[in-house]
Design a protein with these regions (language model features):
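Non-transmembrane, membrane-proximal soluble domains of secreted or membrane proteins
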Residues: 1-169
Length: 169
């Protein structure tokens, strides 16, 4: 049963499709832009300050792509497909509140999929009066990935569809 669930990866056309590239010590989130198609990425274009994913903006679909560092934004109640990879060592992409956890392995592209059923705001309202009160939703690394492991922390924001569309614009 579990294998059927995990291996039932949604088609990119039927989901919000993102790429997450892990590295010591950051989560690089690649969004395809308004055309919904990813531009090419090339290792020779990687620049840790200006282009950590090596996005080729001159490629056919690359001009409107963008990326964030440690900031994952997704819509609520929509299938999310993340193509997960790593630039350096094994990391573990973990969204604790969504019960998502998957190793990111150098040289591999691993699809992960999930659907968030409440917005960040709705989820955090349920945390009032608990240890989670006043916190945010996080992206964690659940694999000891080096001396700076404590620094690989990101944030997850789950939006209503119209707010997500506005954020993308």
């Amino acid at each position: 049963i579990w294998a059927e669930r995990v291996n039932d990866v949604p088609d990119p056309r039927d989901s919000e499709h993102l790429r997450v590239v892990a590295q010591q010590y950051a989560w690089n989130i690649h969004y395809p832009g308004a055309d919904g198609k990813f531009g090419d990425v090339r290792v020779d274009l990687v620049d840790e300050q200006d282009n950590p994913i090596g996005l080729d903006r001159s490629s056919e679909f690359g001009a409107d792509d963008f990326y964030t560092i440690n900031q994952l934004h997704i819509p609520v109640n929509k299938k999310i497909r993340v193509d997960l990879s790593s630039k350096d060592v094994i990391h573990n992409f973990k969204l604790p509140e969504l019960r998502v956890s998957q190793d990111a392995i150098p040289g591999m592209n691993i699809p992960v999929h999930f659907t968030a059923t409440s917005t960040s705001e709705e989820f955090l309202e349920t945390a009032v009066g608990t240890k989670r009160e006043g916190k945010s939703l996080e992206i964690a690394c659940a694999q000891l990935c080096g001396l700076g492991h404590y620094r690989i922390k990101g944030y997850l924001t789950i939006h209503e569809e119209e707010d997500y569309t506005a954020w993308l614009a």
